[in-house]
Amino acid sequence: MVHSGSISELFGLASCHNRFHFRPETSRAVQELSHIKLAGVSPPPTVLATCLEAIPSHFRVLDLSGITHLDSLPPSELPATLNSLQLPQVPLLSPPPSVVSRGIHAIRQYLRDLKHGSSPWWKLKLQVVGRHTSGKSSLVDAMMRWSTHGATAFPYRGRAKLDRTVGVDVVDWQPLPSQSHPPGHPLRLRVFDFGGQDVYHAGHSTFMSDDAMSLLVVDLSLGVAETCRCMVQWLDMLQFQTPGSVVLVVGTHLDMCGTEVRRTVEGVNATVRRWQSERQQQLRATIEALEGSGVVGAMHRASQLRRAVGDVEVDDMGQVVGGGVRVVGELLCVSCTTGEGIGDLVRHVVSIMATGETIAPDLSSTPQLFPRLGKPVPHTYAAFTNALSTALTSKRSAAA
């Protein structure tokens, strides 16, 4: 690791001791500096942690944006005197974006807590979206019933017609029995079931995130044209609000479709492919126009649009870090009443989350679509989220 800019002439890092050392002839000049920038290839976590903790107290700004292959900050005690931390443009796996966005104080606390104790994080967010009355809540109930009782949970009558989701309903779910997972790797999902009425759409962005998986639910009984229209409407919304999210399209009411199922499935899959192609072409045309203008603001906007163009972006570590909405696989058809397709859907969701592939789940593999899965988090972070989950579960049970 080296120090770039003028600091390289004043500061030396003795890698054999992993400590910062001052040259006697430059010691006074170093004391007058407040900004330090580290650059080069990211060292092993233990080495980087030692470097971070050894930064002299008079420095106020730490710039790590020049370090390549940096995917995580190690557990460490950042100097209390630092008031600014500049990171690479590629989002880190640790701390997560929700911590980084709150600034240096939150990052310092997170790394300190991580140093004092951590455990692997096997929880992910599942967003269930779609038109009202498409069967989103019944689908969530059916998947949870299958996880607990298997095929004996069906037939299932579903929710009453007047039992509609108001705003968003949140519930925790372990999709597979504990014995189906490797020791210590029980995948758990926090399910956000979003109300589909138009009046709730404006508030969805408050609870949505682009590092989650979205189930886009469509009602197959509406016919090909209406099913495709509703799906495109929600794909556009997801592209706007969560451009990096992974989307799986699920068709409900399979038992009510009769012989039209095959035609509907083919129509939906063709519409998805056409939607992805059209959105990419539209955004690329806009990008070219903005870049051709030469205006600074337009160039910045072009850079933002490139991130949403729909092309998957991969960082130096081979992990997916951005891009537009990623529709994985083809339409999956289920019946919440008979249970047909529910078990396959649950296993499909787990496979995609755990491996990024539509194959049998193996949680010991390295996930690409959800790279934070299995990474260590502080015990304090896990304890807080577990307490919140317990409170939500208790509230749901009381309401039931």
Which residues are covered by each model-predicted region?
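Short, flexible boundary segments at extreme N-termini or domain junctions of P-loop NTPases and their
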Residues: 80-127, 131, 180-181
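Canonical P-loop GTPase G-domain recognition
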Residues: 98, 102, 108, 256-363
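Concave beta-strand-loop units of leucine-rich repeat
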Residues: 1-6, 12-18, 35-43, 64-69, ...
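Conserved G1/Walker A P-loop phosphate-binding module
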Residues: 112-160, 187
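Switch I (effector-binding) loop of TRAFAC-class P-loop GTPase G-domains
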Residues: 146-184, 198-200
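Noncatalytic alpha-helical scaffolds and linker/capping helices
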Residues: 340-400
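A structural signal for leucine-rich repeat
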Residues: 2-30, 47-56, 73-80, 96-103
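Conserved Switch II/interswitch segment of TRAFAC-class P-loop GTPases
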Residues: 211-232, 242, 254-261
